[in-house]
């Protein structure tokens, strides 16, 4: 199935982007796609019809095709036994898309479609690039890394093959298979101005981000902790389907006198980060990258059941450099956020210093590094 959007522009090369499921996969893919589109590349997307890419990708102006695939980890014995047949079917579907689109480069940014799509690209001899956003690589990318032409990572030392160079701060050559490029963020983050240490005489702006799908623990517990603080302004992104319940919770806790706003989705994320003095959030790879790029202090509450505990590992890349706080979800539920907030709000200059440390760890040119890799693969194939 394909949703095609016509274009009169002259295209030089074609990129097939495989990404979907959550904003952590889709938005980095869109950032790369937009950058290459501006260089006259034709962009086609491979995803699944039931996830957010089916809505976001056409809205961004890109063609998308769908394959039938879903996750297999933790889904019970029957689904596990059926998985090989579903994967084979999805690979065949992906081969059909590749045959139709004829991409010069295929890039997997994560999500269900990346596995079958990556195998199909390899079988058809197409240059395959992987981008692993998380500090702990997922099972699919660990397997696909063996057949990929390039493996790009959002964090240093994600794969064993790159640990030594990344630990020593080396920028490896273009010929290296494994390269630390950072996580692509939307173009608007480049315009965010660094915060200055001058003391915050106004109320402290607190931004709560539950991710593109929302976060139940943050939605239920953060308003309770914020109700005990003074001199704050609050913006809370609660995720689709949670607006009424979270709004009611703030109404009960802060009332009409409190300065708070609840939204299902934040359209202008760079503006929200620019506004914030402190962010309370999960620790998905994209969120950590956006926190660093924005130069804002953050309290990370990793999803406790994330595969391979990758969210904790993501957060630690900043926390280990005193560029963020780590709060386990069980500590959040037990009221640990209240005391941590009190300490943060009492030291506004410390928040600025923490944000500046985070910004120094960001790779603000991640999009350019990824697109450069795609260009090199095309040149090599010519």
Swiss-Prot record:
Pfam families, alphabetized: Glyco_tran_28_C, Glyco_transf_28
Q: What is its main location?
A: membrane
Query: What are the entry keywords?
Result: Cell cycle, Cell division, Cell inner membrane, Cell membrane, Cell shape, Cell wall biogenesis/degradation, Glycosyltransferase, Membrane, Peptidoglycan synthesis, Transferase
Q: What class of enzyme is it?
A: transferase
Does Transferase show up as a keyword for this record? yes
Q: Which reaction does it catalyse?
A: di-trans,octa-cis-undecaprenyl diphospho-N-acetyl-alpha-D-muramoyl-L-alanyl-D-glutamyl-meso-2,6-diaminopimeloyl-D-alanyl-D-alanine + UDP-N-acetyl-alpha-D-glucosamine = di-trans,octa-cis-undecaprenyl diphospho-[N-acetyl-alpha-D-glucosaminyl-(1->4)]-N-acetyl-alpha-D-muramoyl-L-alanyl-D-glutamyl-meso-2,6-diaminopimeloyl-D-alanyl-D-alanine + UDP + H(+)
UniProt name for this protein: UDP-N-acetylglucosamine--N-acetylmuramyl-(pentapeptide) pyrophosphoryl-undecaprenol N-acetylglucosamine transferase
